[in-house]
Each structure stands twice: as structure tokens, then as C-alpha cells.
């Protein structure tokens, strides 16, 4: 007995030691040499990209004044067959200069939220050179696009070296860039002059629009960031060196094969290092930087990142870089929920039980952007759906694979989630509601958004020209998610994953367009998808199919009437349910109605169109089925419950003042 007791104590003590060690915070240190990587990218992937814009940035940041002093050396290489005597630049930070830029006109900046680049010098070929601004649509207040005029053409293979010396004050955060009030936390993105994209003899370099993202070429980055000694820096890429002096530290980051660089600076954050082992045995370092008040979320953040890495490796493709960095931002920061190569920002509510799928969905969504558009770098200004739509679709797949999806919930007092359905609320007090665990069906969140904007704009429309933020959001996020889910259900899940894997392998480190994906899908599945993209990509037709009648026309003969009530077309399945079996037919004709004839000796119960819900854009699934004998008990049950809710609501409202 004594031996058993002693052994039990030993095991408990050992377990406590293991748990304690596991909970210990990590120290953010340089990663050191690794034979599997070169400057942050797997050796195997170095040949997958062509460096076009390479940057060497030396940064000094003063957290007190929020001032960045930067020396930048950019080497741009003409990898095209076309000559150019200009180099265009994005000056995204100038979007915060005043309230008349395309970006700031939406946000109405105050004085603490404004900033702009202040150049001390711009050098080309050891000579000073001037920036020339290009004002889109005559907006002289928007200086987010500029170019330098070269004295001669750069031909294929030629390069140009431009050196910038400038300063930039980090503003109070409004969106994506800035410091958090009340905390020594600054997130710095879109902060340096960055070359546009030269394609087919033209420069693509658009202004910074309020809710759109970016477009730039791949290259190699070397960045040194000097901060006071008590501060820490996390960034795109691998930390290769940390130098300290009496009062300051310099963090050196290298990263090959990316098209942007972002970083944060803070003196109060929890760091946890995790690792993910690929199937080939190589290791990805997961850097988790979490606010002290959200320490309890570290494990959920970690699991979400690892699940995402595993899903991509198993289904689409390897994450090719040495590290991935998650940054949990303060509550007062407006930079959460954004992605950059190798780093992304998240946050979490004070109350976020597991069933809400927050912050899991946010983490998975932002990680997925590492592939779309971190690696498959489409033009987000023109075709935002290629990254936002694909990301929304894949993030939802990951959530349902690893977590089973979330439960329906509503919030009391804005922040406290309650599982169930809320039908009526008065001053944040639920009046008509039900408390029940209901799994949210896949795609439902996107459907709710899509219903708010059925016909304004198409997915094919140029993103920055869509007339409202809602039409942009629906045609970039929710509708493409539903279209991709419909495509998956039409061609099959396995075929969809093969298609995405091929899309990734063919276009990683490139700038594909929508037609590249559409043509690849047609190439794999044949011309049977022509109608699909015509309906869902080029048009904004509303879909609603219904079964409106079942008639017995003879001995063992039945007719089912199916109707297309709106303009949208889909190739549908028609099924007839009997007490013994289920009979199937196809409806592929583009007609408004069709009568389907069935022969069966069994008792007919009902008929249904699209029983597997392949068409996720059908606006009314309730009319998809038709029963021979009406069933009233469900209606009576719902009606009685509804009357009970109304009675409660009237009693509560009647007691108010």
C-alpha cells in the first residue's frame, strides 16, 4: 500500500512539473542557422519565385514620440519583356495625411490619427531625384501613388537601386496601422515606399482605398529595427539577430519570397513559442504574442494555427516559410483581424466560450490569408474575391473539420454570449428567445450576409468600383464563399481539394487572375462548368427553385412539377421519396418549369429539388420540398411556442415605465 501511495504521489508531482514547465512563457530569441531554410524560406521553395523588388530597411523607432526614422534601399529588377523608364511606388502611409484621401474620406481622421511620409532624400545612381505624384481621378489630396522618372529605359534583366531617407510618425490606430491608446503597443504596416507591379508594359499602382488591400511583387527583405531596451519587436520573417547596447536593442529580420513587411513594437506582451512538424520532418516555428489579459487564449490560438497548418499541408500545399507569427492586439487597437506575410493580427472578446468559434474562426481566417493572398498574390484592388472569398471558404472548412462548427448564440449586454436563438431584444435584454444548442449549418453565416445584397454588383466586377461597402463585402466575401461551397458540392469534396491543390501549385508566388482559376477548373472538369461560372461569376441572378405539385396520373405513375421561380439557373437533382426507396432524376435544361415522370409501386411520400443543397445561393430552401400528406403537428408546436413568446414579450413590455 505504501509503495502504491508513494508511486501515486510521484506521478502527481511529475505531472505538475510537466504542466508547470509547459505553462512557462518562452523567450523570443533569434532562430539561428537551419539547413532546411535560407533566410526564412524552405530551400525547396527558393526556385519557386523570381525576386522583383528587394528591400533593405534600417529603422529607428522612438515609442515616446512614435517617430520612425528609416533608411531604405530598394532594388527593383525588370523581369518582364517590356521596357520602362519609370518606377511607380505605393506611399500607403500618405492615406492618413488628411481627410480628403480615398482612404481617409471614409474614416474622418482627427489630428492624432493623421500622418504622412516626410522625405529627407531620394537617391538614384548617386544623384538626388524627385518623386512625381499621380493623382487618381484628379484627387490632388491623395498622394498615395508616386513615380520616379528614369533617365533611360530599363530593359529585361536590368535593375535600379533607389535609396530613401525619411521619417514617419505612427498615428493613433484607425485601421491596420497605428498605436493603441493607453498601451505601449504600435503596429506598423504599409509604412515604406513600395514598388508597384509592372505587368505587360504597364504599371499597376492604385491608391489606398478604404476597405481594400494591396498588390505588390515578391522579393527579399532584410530589416533592422532599433527600439529601447525594454521593448520587443515581432515581424514578418525570421529573427536572425538581436544586438543590445546600454539603452537599446536592434532586431534583425530576414525573409525571402514575400511581397510585404509589417512589424509591431511593445513593452508588455506574453510570448509563447510553439512548433509544427511537417510531414517531411521540417519544423515551422509558431510565434504567439498575446496580451496579458488574454493569456487564457494562448492554447486556443495555438490549436487554431496548428489545425490550419495541418489542413493546408494535407489538402492544398505546404506553408513554405520558417515561421508564422500571431499577434493578439490590445482592446484599444484598431489593427486586429489583418494579415501580412508571415504575421497576422487577432483579438478576442472577454467572454468567448468554445462553442462560439471565436477567436478560432478569426485566427484560421487570418492564417488562411497567408496562402490567399500571401502566396497566391492576386490583385486585391481589382479582384478581392480571389483572396477574401477563397479565405472565407477554406476557413469555414477548417472550422467544421476540426471543431464541428459553432453553436447559434446571441449576446447580452453586447459582450456575453448565450447559446440559443434570439428573436426580439429590447435595450440589450432578450425578450423573445430560446435557449438551446443548435449547430450552425455550414455556410449559414455567409447566407445571412448574401441576403442583404442579392443583386448589386457581381463577383466579376472590379472590386474598388463596387458602389457600397456592403456590395463589396458580399461580392468579395460571402457570395464567393457560397459559390465555392456550391462548386464543391457540385463536383465533390475530393475533386475540389485536388482543384485547390493544383491552383496553389501552379500559381504560388505569382499574380493569378479570376480567369486563371476559372480556366483551371474547366480544364479539370471539362466544359460542364461553363454554365456554373456564367451564373455565379458574371451575373447577379437570384436563385429560387421549388416543387409545387405531385400528381398521380395512373397506375404507379406520378408527375412532379418543379419550377424556377427566379432568374438564376442551376443543374439540379430531383428526388421522389417513397416508403421503400428514393428515386432520382436530373434537371439540366435552362427552362422555367419542368414536369418529371416517375414510376413506382410504392407509396409516394414527398418530392424534393436539390436535396443535398448544392446550390447555396437558393434564397428559399423551404419550398424545395413538397409532401403528399400535410403534417400539422410541427406547425402547431411552433405556433404554441410563438404565442407563449408573444405573451412573455407583452408582459415585459407592459411592465416598462
PLM regions and their residue ranges:
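N-terminal, polar/Ser/Thr-rich
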Residues: 15-69, 182, 530-531, 535
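A surface-exposed beta-strand-loop module
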Residues: 26, 67, 77, 107-184, ...
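Hydrophobic alpha-helical and helix-loop surface patches within well-folded domains
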Residues: 32, 253, 288-562
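Solvent-exposed beta-hairpin/edge-strand motifs
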Residues: 86-129, 230, 577-582
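Extended, low-hydrophobicity, Ser/Thr/Pro/Gly-biased non-transmembrane segments
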Residues: 112-115, 161-268, 610, 647-656
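Coil residues (strongly favoring Ser/Thr
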Residues: 143, 159, 244, 268, ...
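Beta-strand-rich binding/interaction modules
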Residues: 235, 529-530, 543-545, 550-612
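Extracellular/periplasmic ectodomains of large secreted or surface enzymes and adhesion receptors
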Residues: 549, 605-657
Amino acid at each position: 500500500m505504501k509503495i502504491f501511495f508513494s508511486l501515486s504521489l510521484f506521478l502527481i508531482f511529475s505531472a505538475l512539473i510537466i504542466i508547470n514547465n509547459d505553462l512557462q512563457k518562452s523567450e523570443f530569441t533569434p532562430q539561428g542557422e537551419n539547413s532546411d531554410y535560407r533566410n526564412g524560406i524552405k530551400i525547396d521553395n527558393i526556385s519557386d519565385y523570381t525576386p522583383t523588388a528587394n528591400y533593405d530597411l534600417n529603422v529607428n523607432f522612438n515609442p515616446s514620440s512614435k517617430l520612425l526614422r528609416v533608411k531604405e534601399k530598394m532594388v527593383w529588377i525588370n523581369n518582364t519583356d517590356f521596357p520602362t523608364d519609370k518606377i511607380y511606388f505605393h506611399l500607403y502611409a500618405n492615406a492618413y495625411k488628411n481627410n480628403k484621401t480615398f482612404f481617409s474620406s471614409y474614416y474622418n481622421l482627427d489630428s492624432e490619427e493623421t500622418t504622412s511620409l516626410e522625405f529627407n532624400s531620394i537617391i538614384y545612381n548617386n544623384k538626388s531625384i524627385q518623386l512625381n505624384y499621380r493623382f487618381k481621378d484628379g484627387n490632388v489630396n491623395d498622394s498615395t501613388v508616386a513615380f520616379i522618372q528614369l533617365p533611360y529605359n530599363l530593359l529585361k534583366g536590368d535593375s535600379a537601386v533607389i535609396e530613401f531617407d525619411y521619417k514617419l510618425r505612427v498615428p493613433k490606430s484607425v485601421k491596420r496601422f497605428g498605436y493603441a491608446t493607453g498601451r505601449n503597443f504600435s503596429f506598423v504596416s504599409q509604412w515604406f515606399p513600395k514598388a508597384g507591379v509592372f505587368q505587360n508594359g504597364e504599371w499597376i499602382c492604385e491608391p489606398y482605398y478604404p476597405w481594400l488591400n494591396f498588390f505588390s511583387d515578391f522579393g527579399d527583405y532584410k530589416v533592422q529595427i532599433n527600439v529601447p531596451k525594454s521593448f520587443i519587436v515581432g515581424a514578418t520573417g525570421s529573427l536572425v539577430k538581436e544586438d543590445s547596447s546600454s539603452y537599446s536593442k536592434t532586431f534583425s529580420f530576414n525573409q525571402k519570397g514575400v511581397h510585404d513587411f509589417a512589424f509591431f513594437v511593445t513593452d508588455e506582451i506574453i510570448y509563447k513559442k510553439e512548433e509544427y512538424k511537417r510531414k517531411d520532418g521540417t519544423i515551422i516555428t509558431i510565434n504567439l504574442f498575446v496580451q496579458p489579459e488574454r493569456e487564457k487564449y494562448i492554447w486556443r490560438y495555438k490549436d487554431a494555427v496548428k489545425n490550419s497548418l495541418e489542413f493546408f499541408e494535407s489538402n492544398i500545399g505546404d506553408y513554405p516559410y520558417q515561421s508564422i507569427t500571431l499577434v493578439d492586439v490590445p482592446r484599444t487597437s484598431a489593427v486586429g483581424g489583418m494579415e501580412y506575410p508571415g504575421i497576422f493580427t487577432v483579438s478576442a472578446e472577454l467572454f468567448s466560450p468554445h462553442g462560439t468559434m471565436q477567436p478560432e474562426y478569426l485566427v484560421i481566417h487570418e492564417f488562411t490569408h497567408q496562402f490567399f493572398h500571401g502566396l497566391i498574390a492576386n490583385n486585391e484592388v481589382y479582384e478581392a474575391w480571389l483572396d477574401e472569398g477563397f479565405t472565407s471558404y477554406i476557413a469555414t472548412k477548417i472550422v467544421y473539420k476540426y471543431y464541428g462548427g459553432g453553436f447559434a448564440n446571441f449576446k447580452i449586454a453586447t459582450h456575453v454570449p448565450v447559446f440559443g436563438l434570439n428573436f426580439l431584444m429590447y435595450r440589450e435584454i432578450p425578450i423573445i428567445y430560446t435557449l438551446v444548442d443548435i449547430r450552425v449549418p455550414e455556410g449559414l453565416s455567409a447566407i445571412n450576409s448574401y441576403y442583404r445584397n442579392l443583386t448589386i454588383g457581381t463577383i466579376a466586377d472590379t472590386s474598388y468600383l463596387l458602389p457600397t461597402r456592403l456590395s463589396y463585402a458580399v461580392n468579395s466575401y460571402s457570395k464567393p464563399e457560397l459559390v465555392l461551397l456550391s462548386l464543391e458540392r457540385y463536383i465533390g469534396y475530393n475533386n475540389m481539394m485536388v482543384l485547390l491543390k493544383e491552383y496553389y501549385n501552379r500559381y504560388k508566388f505569382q499574380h493569378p487572375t479570376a480567369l486563371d482559376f476559372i480556366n483551371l477548373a474547366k480544364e479539370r472538369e471539362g466544359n460542364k462548368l461553363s454554365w456554373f461560372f456564367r451564373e455565379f461569376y458574371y451575373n447577379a441572378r437570384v436563385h429560387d427553385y421549388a416543387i409545387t405539385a405531385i400528381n398521380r396520373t395512373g397506375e404507379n405513375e406520378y408527375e412532379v412539377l418543379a419550377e424556377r421561380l427566379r432568374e438564376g439557373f442551376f443543374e439540379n437533382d430531383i428526388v421522389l421519396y417513397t416508403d421503400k426507396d428514393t428515386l432520382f432524376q436530373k434537371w439540366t435544361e435552362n427552362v422555367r418549369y419542368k414536369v418529371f415522370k416517375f414510376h413506382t409501386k410504392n407509396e409516394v411520400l414527398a418530392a424534393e429539388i436539390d436535396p443535398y443543397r448544392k446550390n447555396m445561393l437558393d434564397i428559399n430552401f423551404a419550398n424545395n420540398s413538397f409532401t403528399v400528406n400535410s403534417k400539422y403537428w410541427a406547425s402547431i408546436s411552433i405556433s404554441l411556442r410563438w404565442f407563449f413568446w408573444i405573451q412573455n414579450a407583452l408582459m415585459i413590455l407592459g411592465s416598462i415605465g
